[in-house]
């Protein structure tokens, strides 16, 4: 097909306004602020995050006129609980039926979601590798929203499993992963307190965590070490309110400190991050890797020295190729 032009000078808002991307376009960036709406694609790393192939795949799917956006909850549930209206997932069908599938969870500090760079770009690349992928959009922008986001994650898995024949995927066989806050959420599926066992869903065959944030005790330490008005205090406070609620205490934060709730049954893990990450410190990913080593959990890492946060596919960085490596690891351990 003949694709619409995509240039580095185009703004995120131009993509959202375009009709050629259908429902995919409305989920490029949730709860967007003017700074992102007006930002040129070049400012995110035009080639680094794979804008062109991703937008082409979105245009291909939208051009079919089929539905690829699915609400997580029934109409009755959406009517009775106001915040269950927005949670949904996007379906990126792969070229081969009956294969395992992947669920991708974009990040955004539980305040919004960078759906294109940390969701659709990964799904489009997985399609190229022969896999069907689903991009999860969960509840954000509330105090104590992580527990609700975990509920959304399991609602997504249950719906895909129940409709496996319709989606032409292999039930019970999947990889799940996420980026930043999305990785925080994905990681909980293996935890002893919020994990797949308590939710009654199939165990994921592998989890990938990209620049994850799991050391909640460290975020709490930053919150208490600096006074109100200091950027470290205020940034940690905003994040921890969304994680644990308005009463930020060690007791409220502790259940979400992932490595305190991992055991040997945790699924195999693939980790990627950069040492110079200024948003989710590299120590988060390193701690997960060290915990996996200690507990004998199969794991693989692709760490870079530079590249910071939010790199998505990471094309042109030291970590380039991490997704292909993660998929190979998934195929090896499943």
Stretches with model-predicted labels:
Residues 155-226:
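Primarily recognizes the serine-hydrolase "nucleophile elbow" in alpha/beta-hydrolase
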Residues 74, 218-261, 267:
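Mobile cap/lid helix-loop segments that gate and shape the active-site cleft of serine hydrolases
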Residues 22-97:
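N-terminal cap/lid segment of alpha/beta-hydrolase-fold proteins
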Residues 114-122, 134-171, 314-321:
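Catalytic nucleophile-loop/oxyanion-hole region of alpha/beta-hydrolase
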Residues 1-8, 272, 279-334:
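C-terminal catalytic histidine-bearing segment of alpha/beta-hydrolase fold enzymes
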Residues 99-107:
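Short beta-strand element of the alpha/beta-hydrolase
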Residues 112, 216, 276-280:
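Acidic catalytic loop of the alpha/beta-hydrolase fold
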Residues 265, 270-273, 277:
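Short beta-strand/loop motif that positions the catalytic acidic residue
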């Amino acid at each position: 097909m003949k694709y619409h032009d995509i240039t580095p000078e185009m703004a995120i808002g131009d993509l959202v306004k375009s009709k050629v991307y259908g429902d995919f376009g409305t989920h490029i960036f949730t709860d967007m602020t003017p700074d992102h709406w007006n930002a040129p694609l070049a400012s995110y790393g035009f080639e680094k995050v794979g804008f062109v192939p991703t937008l082409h795949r979105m245009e291909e799917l939208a051009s079919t006129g089929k539905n690829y956006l699915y609400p997580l909850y029934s109409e009755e549930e959406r009517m009775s609980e106001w915040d269950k209206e927005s949670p949904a997932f996007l379906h990126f069908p792969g070229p081969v039926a009956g294969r395992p599938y992947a669920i991708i969870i974009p990040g955004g500090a539980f305040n919004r979601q960078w759906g294109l760079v940390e969701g659709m770009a990964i799904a489009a690349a997985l399609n190229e590798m022969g896999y069907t992928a689903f991009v999860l959009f969960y509840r954000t922008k509330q105090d104590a929203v992580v527990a609700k986001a975990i509920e959304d994650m399991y609602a997504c898995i249950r719906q895909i499993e129940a409709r496996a024949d319709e989606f032409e995927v292999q039930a019970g066989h999947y990889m799940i992963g996420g980026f930043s806050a999305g990785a925080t959420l994905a990681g909980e599926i293996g935890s002893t307190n919020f994990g797949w066992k308590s939710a009654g869903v199939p165990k994921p065959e592998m989890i990938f965590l990209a620049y994850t944030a799991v050391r909640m005790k460290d975020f709490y330490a930053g919150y208490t070490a600096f006074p109100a008005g200091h950027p470290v205090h205020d940034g940690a406070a905003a994040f921890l309110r969304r994680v644990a609620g308005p009463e930020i205490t060690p007791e409220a934060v502790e259940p979400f400190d992932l490595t305190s709730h991992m055991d040997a049954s945790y699924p195999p893990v693939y980790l990627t991050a950069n040492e110079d990450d200024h948003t989710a410190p590299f120590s988060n990913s390193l701690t997960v890797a060290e915990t996996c080593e200690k507990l004998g959990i199969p794991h693989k890492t692709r760490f870079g020295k530079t590249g910071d946060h939010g790199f998505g596919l990471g094309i042109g960085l030291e970590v380039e190729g991490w997704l292909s490596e993660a998929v190979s690891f998934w195929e090896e351990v499943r």
